[in-house]
């Protein structure tokens, strides 16, 4: 059995956090890999916004700048056989899972070489080869879908786990409660990860959620629930490690609430006046990227030169994917009728 303490500890930021017994600490190579994934998200996010400003992309974009730590510290623990189900603000989850950037960008740009032949766009991406199973624009729907993959893993007798990513607003959707209940009853190997950035679209957390910590809701469904510092890679890693090991051992699901903050509005270009200047300043101060970079340097895990070289390599990877996507063709008119019905509809 994997043991979890029953008491809550308060971190320096007042975040409720429970530490799993035998807290896992990533080795040096794993810490650098977490940072690599974080930088991959940040560079991809920044260059996406640049392309939108230049008018080269016209699709809606939901930035996750500030939330890089969460999927990076989780994905480093997953195999390609392990699956993720995410939401419209989920490109960072896919990038952290090491989804190839060329087909990702081709899909974002609506090109035929995209993961969904240009029909899905940035809100409906998939790449089963790396375990990216579904991106959904329906709030809360990633969780029951994840249960389906968890049930399949049980039937197949594998050790696969599925991670369901969602936001704090989705914790108030009926699908959240139904999914957690079923996952607990059937002991599904699913980890429910709430990326709590404090806002449900434009609504403050406290104006739409009845509990101070979403993780408390896990108790009602007989599963462990933990609120962790979503800006601390080592905290996320330790809790995700325990949750994943528990799931692989057949002991069922875990709810992880990762407290964080998104630097931008709900959708790129919207008015974020509902965020105060003080909140934005505090978020930038708590930016996980420079903090973790400095920690790696201070601890002797990597040098500044090594991390700069890694960043340059990743930026080149993103730029290559952009150039590739822009050179791809748009889908033909005939493609509109494909992948819609079981039998192809004649023109």
Predicted segment positions?
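Conserved acidic/glycine
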Residues: 2-70, 258, 268-273, 277-347
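A broad, low-specificity signal marking well-ordered, structured residues that form hydrophobic/aromatic
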Residues: 7, 123, 254
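Cofactor-binding active-site loop characterized by glycine-rich and histidine/acidic residues
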Residues: 46, 50, 54-186, 204-210, ...
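Glycine-rich ThDP/TPP pyrophosphate-binding loop and its adjacent helix/strand module
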Residues: 132-327
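N-proximal short alpha-helices
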Residues: 21, 115-119, 256, 265
């Amino acid at each position: 059995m994997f043991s979890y303490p029953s008491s809550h500890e308060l971190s320096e930021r007042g975040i409720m956090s429970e530490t799993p017994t035998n807290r896992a600490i990533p080795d040096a190579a794993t810490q650098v890999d977490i940072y690599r994934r974080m930088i991959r998200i940040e560079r991809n996010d920044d260059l996406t916004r640049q392309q939108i400003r230049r008018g080269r992309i016209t699709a809606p974009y939901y930035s996750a700048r500030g939330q890089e730590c969460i999927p990076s510290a989780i994905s480093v623990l997953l195999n390609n056989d392990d699956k993720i189900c995410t939401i419209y603000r989920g490109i960072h989850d896919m990038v952290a899972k090491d989804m190839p950037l060329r087909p990702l960008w081709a899909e974002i740009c609506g090109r035929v070489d995209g993961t969904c032949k240009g029909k899905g766009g940035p809100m409906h991406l998939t790449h089963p080869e790396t375990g990216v199973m579904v991106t959904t624009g329906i709030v809360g729907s990633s969780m029951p879908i994840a249960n389906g993959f968890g049930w399949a893993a049980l039937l197949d007798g594998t050790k696969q786990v599925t991670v369901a990513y969602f936001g704090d607003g989705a914790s108030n959707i009926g699908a959240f409660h139904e999914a957690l209940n079923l996952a607990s009853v059937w002991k599904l190997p699913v980890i429910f990860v709430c990326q709590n950035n404090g806002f449900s679209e434009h609504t403050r957390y406290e104006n739409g959620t009845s509990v101070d910590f979403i993780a408390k809701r896990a108790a009602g469904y007989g599963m462990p629930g933990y609120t962790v510092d979503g800006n601390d890679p080592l905290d996320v890693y330790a809790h995700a490690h325990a949750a994943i090991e528990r799931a692989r051992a057949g002991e069922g699901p875990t709810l992880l609430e990762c407290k964080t903050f998104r630097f931008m509005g709900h959708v790129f270009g919207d008015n974020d006046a509902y965020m105060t200047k003080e909140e934005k300043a505090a978020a930038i101060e708590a930016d996980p990227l420079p903090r973790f970079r400095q920690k790696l340097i201070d601890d002797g895990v990597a040098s500044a030169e090594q991390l700069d070289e890694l960043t340059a390599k990743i930026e080149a990877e993103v730029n290559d994917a952009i150039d590739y996507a822009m050179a791809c063709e748009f889908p033909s008119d005939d493609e509109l009728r494909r992948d819609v019905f079981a039998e192809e509809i004649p023109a």
